């Protein structure tokens, strides 16, 4: 059994936590995030730490305690330092550039792919073949990165496509006569 839920979350300077009407909200320099609290979990805020307790002794309450603690830890990290995901474009003529708040991708299609960024998520293009997606909400950052990668996932023979910077693409051997 994991004991993630029992570990307290230290609140860094600049992070404020508020628990009201069954909603946990965390405010920091990068914005505000909120998460509904499950009825099987109790939240305690004291002396710069955030702790979670199960409301009863059921297995579901113990599981939700760990889940709520992990979500809250991601919220605290998100509003203080933020999250980022790096993508690489591999292929001849594959390019990315910002067009206002949207991301314009040239991925070998007959048309350019324009991906609108949701609220709270920003994209940067340090080079034409690199994309950095940043934001306070870990789930949104990962979702946007997955959506951009899905336009042209890495193909298994040459490795062309959009990939995460830390992703290793295993190449297949071509058919021999």
UniProtKB/Swiss-Prot annotation:
The keyword rRNA-binding applies. Pfam families: Ribosomal_L6. GO terms for cellular component: cytosolic large ribosomal subunit. It comes from the Bacteria. GO terms for molecular function: rRNA binding; structural constituent of ribosome. InterPro entries: Ribosomal_uL6-like, Ribosomal_uL6-like_a/b-dom_sf, Ribosomal_uL6_a/b-dom, Ribosomal_uL6_bac-type, Ribosomal_uL6_CS. One of its GO terms (biological process) is cytoplasmic translation. Keywords: Ribonucleoprotein, Ribosomal protein, RNA-binding, rRNA-binding. The keyword Cell membrane does not apply. Belongs to the universal ribosomal protein uL6 family. This protein binds to the 23S rRNA, and is important in its secondary structure. It is located near the subunit interface in the base of the L7/L12 stalk, and near the tRNA binding site of the peptidyltransferase center. Part of the 50S ribosomal subunit. This is Large ribosomal subunit protein uL6. It comes from Cupriavidus metallidurans (strain ATCC 43123 / DSM 2839 / NBRC 102507 / CH34) (Ralstonia metallidurans). The gene is rplF.
